[in-house]
Amino acid sequence: MKILRNYLNNVKPSFVGEGRYSKWFPLFDAIENLFFSYTKKTKNPIHVRDAIDIQKVMVTVWLATFPAMFFGMYNVGANSLEYLDSINQQNTGDWHHYLISIVGYDSNSFFSKLWFGACYFLPIYFVVFTVGIAWEALFAIVRKHEINEGAFVSTVLFSLSCPPDLPLWQAAMGISFGLVIGKEIFGGTGKNFLNPALTGRAFLYFAYPAQISGDKVWVAGISDYNIIPEGYSGATALGVAAESGMSGITNSYTWMDAFLGNIPGSVGETSIIAILIGLIILLVTKVASWRIVAGTLVGMILMSSLLNIAGSDTNPMFAIPWYWHAVIGSFAFGLVFMATEPVSGSGTNTGRYIYGFVIGITVILIRVINPAFPEGMMLAILFANLLAPVIDHLVVMANVKKRKALFNE
């Protein structure tokens, strides 16, 4: 590394100031920070000194996704190999086969399941990451500022929220829309009012619904063979609930299956225990706000309980209790990694409770009341993103009035 450090020091003058390659400084700066810690220090005494910076925050979130990522790859392999065994096939029927065949299709092997899932997830992540960094670099060069690490988080969250069979070109389009429309046109990292990963996923959901919803996209291989053997279902637990309520869920899965993640779904959204590990990391490092988490849980429990009491003879979703809502769909993943994003969420402490409460109520209303969207977490968070500035404004104004009243007394 000393050789690389010396080389970067030697060529750095060409990239800074009026150097020959100064317009490419954002790329040089990104490469330097990739291999070496940020060395600039603020010496002026008026600045607050802290060991944390944007780079460390983004890396912490990125690492916090690893438990969900690795379990997700294993779960994709387990579900897909089970499906292939049920139709007596040992070939995915597409280009993934050439990668999977390196290890084989052994449904009894842990590593085989992990490798199978990796062969589906990693290409998606590679394409999303490459396209995302390319957009980040392009805007950094045009605006002449450093490349922020925000793309690291947006790309991994977007990839984990996708089904394993998502076409690579759609993955590229989704992250492009999310980063460009959801973040860069508003000024980049720190200035976006919508979560970029969710913005990209929402674009895919409405533009290409066949590839990101339904019963055939959550288990890799079903879309290739288009064969559903008798007694087999590739539907998610939330999809089953929307069709037949609690009886359908309990006949297909146990609560523990959903908690551990042994169910079909998006790559990173199935295992609640893996997501909770990530939540602990984010809370301990104070990257995520526990107030948003608490507000969302209270809102979700309250609204689902009210709908349980109200009941419905025609809508089976009314009967789903809160503890099932918490472990199915993308509720946990969205809460931990999307709702707690500090940029697009509320910034005041009181506002964070309200912001989370709005998400909790909205996700249940969309899931239960709206038959077109059995999964409501994505839309609930985006809706709360739009309200976050208003919430903070009202909280600040209320505090101003309170202080004025105290002063006048």
Tell where the protein language model's regions lie, with residue ranges.
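Structural signature of hydrophobic alpha-helical transmembrane segments
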Residues: 114-128, 165-174, 261-272, 318-331
